[in-house]
Amino acid sequence: MNIQKFLKKKIKKICIKLGLPENFNPIIQKNIKKKNIDYQINGIIKLKKKKSNYHYKLAKKISYYMNKSKIYKKISISKPGFINITLDSNWICTNINNMFIAKNFNISFKKPKKIIIDYSSPNIAKEMHVGHLRSTILGDTTARILKFLGHNVIKQNHIGDWGIQFGMLITQLKLESKISFKNIEKIYKKSYLNYKKNPIFFKKTKKNVVKLQKKDKKCIYIWKKIVKKSIKKNNKVYKKLNVSLKKKDIRGESFYNFMLPGIISDLKKKKIAVNYQGCVIVYLKNFKNRLGKKMGVVIQKKDGAFLYTTTDIACLKYRCKTLKADRIIYYIDNRQKQHLLQIWNIAKKAKYFTKKILLEHHSFGMILHKNKKPFKTRNGDTIKLIKLLNKGVTKAKEKIKKKNRKIKKKELKKIAHNIGIGAIKYFDLSKKRKLDYIFDWDKMLSLEGNTAPYIQYAYIRIKSIIKKNTTIFQNDKYKINIFTSFERQLIFSIFQFEEIIHILEKKGTPHLMCNYLYDLSGKFSKFYENCSILNAKEKHIKISRIKLSILTSKIIKKCLYFLGIKTVSKM
């Protein structure tokens, strides 16, 4: 239950009744300073002062109407105009018990929308590297949450499966004594060097790009083989990462090729694009070049070749006109901001989408080394994502073996995988999305602080309590009740679950979910340390506390699921 939203709705009704404007925001915050106060209304003091003591008198009027409701135990006012709320324990217990028995934690669902999420999107012919981690796991977390909330989620893995790199690869493979697709990355590096240094190779590459566009049989055969091989490798990474992307979610750049000539002619027809020195260019007023003049965006080269911008315009049109999206979220790093804004600007001019469609760039920062430079190998090469994940599992395995030398190999393998991968993902997702962060093995694998191992361990501890009482919690006669302040604080933390879910639905900020998990686990630890659960003298207290433990464990597991992290049975 989202208590803040519930209270805000009730209080706004009173405020409108008292003549305050409909757009007035009462601002309700969880109280963390004063004992015996649950929430505080502090938006009143932001209103323009009319007379002396205006805010205090208005707070008194609002509290008068609030006192008519049975959901409040106590309402007090503090100067200059704060309203302090203590909620009724019976009302709290009714709602926490409803949450306990409900299928989806009694969360309120909005009208479902068709939401497209563009994420991961690696280039073909290269192995996924550490730079793909953020887009992949940020996008996947959002996809899981939106699906849970009943939205029609369309995941789009916009892979780079077209362009000049395939001309280079085809040229190089034709030069090899035997065409082999075993090590595409090595062939790509070789082809790139030849393309840069060898003028003959450069010309052949251009010719092979044209041949590929004209669907030459041999070129298409090589292209398909490269794409298939790369997708197979990427899928292994997704599986290891516990990411929900599947083959059906792939819609690469090549998919939109059939639309590109039509996009060019349409933009020219609408006088958005013009011919200039053999190229087709769109001039944008909102973007300036180095000379301070309108920036020109090339959408077709002299040789007739299309650019990434052209493909991305076609892609946006397809998502809006054909897939009928209500909202499109792009998980692309900060450096692509201008490129994305230019696409949206051109597509808006062409009326490829309406104002009703929400376009969002959920940008993110970089992963840095301890020296605050981009996270790379000692040689300066990009770190392969699969190698990073394997290293995480190995490090987790070493930690587990130190604590539990008798653990069986099969069990060790599974637990180390879930802890190692979980640690990498959680460490990333716990950081503010828009900021860069420093990659640190010791911090992410620590059992202390806001880390995956800490949360996974908290879950194990709760489950051990429940396992000892597998039948008692099924008793419907006794409900969750409040006997101490520790239970009350834990219940309020549980109530915040819905609030966090809806913030992530709007903003795609999973660090808030990680902070929430850490707070919830901490509140449970205090409850566990100060309240007797298994040894409670009275049956109704014992059952109440076990049920509260069960609900906490379910929410921790669900939050970890949203983050794409698996729980473990032991550590």
Swiss-Prot record:
SUPFAM superfamilies: Anticodon-binding domain of a subclass of class I aminoacyl-tRNA synthetases (SSF47323), Arginyl-tRNA synthetase (ArgRS), N-terminal 'additional' domain (SSF55190), Nucleotidylyl transferase (SSF52374). The keyword Magnesium does not apply. One of its GO terms (cellular component) is cytoplasm. The keyword Ligase applies. SMART domains: Arg_tRNA_synt_N, DALR_1. Keywords: Aminoacyl-tRNA synthetase, ATP-binding, Cytoplasm, Ligase, Nucleotide-binding, Protein biosynthesis. Its main location: cytoplasm. Monomer. This is Arginine--tRNA ligase. It comes from Buchnera aphidicola subsp. Cinara cedri (strain Cc). The lineage of its organism: Bacteria, Pseudomonadati, Pseudomonadota, Gammaproteobacteria, Enterobacterales. The gene is argS.
